[in-house]
């Protein structure tokens, strides 16, 4: 449908109307998290969603019509988000929704919602996510779907949590794992990776001399507010943030444009806090010591042996990702024992590779085709 062309006066009028409404009722412009679901499990702030099947015969994803498959694949698909982003990113907009895309392909779709972390949740640790919650999540999906196996589609830190779970549990019920922009080798992740690599030895020396570890310090000192993650994300492309704000001003009259733009902005503006205990574990084990890349890691009292992972693995990296380099994401293939494993570099930055305007043509399409032959 072609948009009606508006004159300057009409554009000014609608710019004022939309500007006032955006200021007073900003949620009117947010079009994420619209897919219907049931909550099948919850523990503290974490919950698991089961999405309803689509009633449509076809849906539109990024301008392309996709027929809705009426026959379900036997193995359910579990979506695992990173800790810093809310679950909305998997159901970003009706026409750019990973949830709707995989529902249309005939998958029984589940999603983990890690919840809204506050300063009261500073005790949440890697052990909480990996050793306590992940087993419960997997079991709830298997019970709900009446399936003995599960496939996982994960993004960024969500992929690392899935890998740590598999490395500690030796769970053979996870048949397929997809990781998107997951920084397995953190010392290879751009400028931050080079800094971590450079300070690794000095940090070890200082820790040994002073007989002190970050792990011994109170967790409350390490709690990271969501706005910090938002700022760091935006600083990877400062000009992009400026241009986006300018574009919103110029298109204030266009309600549909505003809905998309403000929904995307909500992703980056409303990031979730990182719990202090989790940050301590990440900083020492994953960032400074790069333990996942080494293939072995201690999580609480459990040993994570990544060479015990033998499920099918598909990994992605974005060709313009400033946060997670291709070599950092590809490292997953080296630490697992899986025979069926592959890696793709696809168009997009850290967000674009996952849910950008062209992700459905690359990351999603490749994943859907790959899973189809492994979900019977």
Question: What positions do the PLM features span?
Answer:
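Short beta-strand/loop motif that positions the catalytic acidic residue
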Residues: 309, 315-317, 321
């Amino acid at each position: 449908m072609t948009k009606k062309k508006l004159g300057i006066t009409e554009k000014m009028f609608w710019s004022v109307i939309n500007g006032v409404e955006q200021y007073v009722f900003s949620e009117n412009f947010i079009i994420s998290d619209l897919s219907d679901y049931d909550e099948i499990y919850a523990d503290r702030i974490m919950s698991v969603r089961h999405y309803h099947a689509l009633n449509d015969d076809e849906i539109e994803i990024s301008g392309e019509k996709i027929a809705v498959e009426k026959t379900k694949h036997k193995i359910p698909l579990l979506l695992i988000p990173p800790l810093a982003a809310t679950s909305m990113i998997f159901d970003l907009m009706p026409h750019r929704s990973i949830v709707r895309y995989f529902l249309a392909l005939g998958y029984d779709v589940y999603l983990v919602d890690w919840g809204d972390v506050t300063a009261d949740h500073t005790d949440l640790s890697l052990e909480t996510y990996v050793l306590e919650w992940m087993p419960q999540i997997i079991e709830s999906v298997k019970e709900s779907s009446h399936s003995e196996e599960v496939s996982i589609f994960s993004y960024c830190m969500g992929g690392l949590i899935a890998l740590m779970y598999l490395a500690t549990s030796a769970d053979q019920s996870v048949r397929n794992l997809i990781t998107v922009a997951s920084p397995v080798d953190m010392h290879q992740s751009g400028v931050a990776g080079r800094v971590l690599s450079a300070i690794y030895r000095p940090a070890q020396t200082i820790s040994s001399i002073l007989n002190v570890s970050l792990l011994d310090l109170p967790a409350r000192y390490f709690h990271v507010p969501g706005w910090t993650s938002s700022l760091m994300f935006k600083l990877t492309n400062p000009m992009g943030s400026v241009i986006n704000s300018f574009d919103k001003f110029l298109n204030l009259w266009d309600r549909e444009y505003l809905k998309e733009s403000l929904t995307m902005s909500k992703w980056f503006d409303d990031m979730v806090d990182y719990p202090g205990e989790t940050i301590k574990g990440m900083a020492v084990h994953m960032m400074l010591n790069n333990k996942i890349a080494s293939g072995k890691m201690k999580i609480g009292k459990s040993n994570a042996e990544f060479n015990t992972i033998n499920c099918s693995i598909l990994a992605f990296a974005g060709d313009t990702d400033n946060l997670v380099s291709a070599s950092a994401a590809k490292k997953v293939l080296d630490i697992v024992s899986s025979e069926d494993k592959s890696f793709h570099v696809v168009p997009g930055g850290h967000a674009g590779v996952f849910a950008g305007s062209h992700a459905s043509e690359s990351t999603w399409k490749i994943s859907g085709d790959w899973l189809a032959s492994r979900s019977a």
